Amino acid sequence: TNWWEKLTTNITYQGKFNQEILENLLTSANLVKDRDFFPQKKQTTYDIDDNKDKDVIPDMLLKFPERNYIVDAKVSLTHWTKYINEKDEKQKKQYLKDHLASVRNHLFGPKGLVKKNYNKLYGIKSLQSIIVFFPASNLYSITLDADKTLQTEALKANFILSSPTDLLNMIKIFEQIKSEKKQIENISK
């Protein structure tokens, strides 16, 4: 099987592909693996539905002095790739509709991110919101343009939807906060 077929049909491969894009993006922002970010690091959270602790493996943990940030990179590409390659307009609309349903299921479905309780991880001062990474800017913008309520519903559920550019901008802000904090500490010494 070639890589394109895997990318368009195999959800596990898609997840690894998305995660690789995310890791490359973080590295390009001068973050260092296993110091500034930690891929697939097992954490413990509280499962309110089962009333017990459970282990989870977030795609990425970004570590900054004041806060840590959880990033999910598992947006499905199956229907998206069909959508961008389809010539027939009627079929193209259906693939986009299927893609939107897939994104919503990933966020809000019975086994979706909303059930993972990433914002309740033990021992990690993480933001209440989870950053949901879309690995391509056009994937992000077309998804939000086609589903006008997705962004609002995501924010209500403590998800920050992010394109690669958005994530780089957030990292820049986090880095500036870290730098300013260091300057203040140096001045007060």
Task: Tell where the protein language model's regions lie, with residue ranges.
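Amphipathic, heptad-repeat alpha-helical coiled-coil/stalk segments that mediate oligomerization
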Residues: 2-189
